[in-house]
Design a protein with these regions (language model features):
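Exposed beta-strand/loop interface patches that mediate assembly or binding
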Residues: 1-69
């Protein structure tokens, strides 16, 4: 089992870069990467270009929490 300190992440803000069958790729406002496809919580649908709050772990897992203006 991983130690809690090894599994921490932060809530980030970003923009939907791509919509795929396997989830959404998000480009964070801070940083120079694009996430692997991650799901949206509660099955909410988003459009490319929408601003979202999300979390993303180093192992490529994460989720989109909500959209914002």
């Amino acid at each position: 089992m991983e130690a809690i300190s090894e599994t921490r992440t932060t809530i980030e803000r970003g923009q939907i870069a791509q919509k795929l069958e396997s989830g959404y790729r998000v480009c964070p406002f801070v940083g120079s990467y694009v996430t692997a496809p991650i799901p949206a919580l509660f099955g909410v649908a988003y459009d490319v270009g929408e601003n979202v709050y999300f979390f993303y772990f180093d192992d490529g897992k994460g989720a989109i929490l909500a959209a914002f203006d």
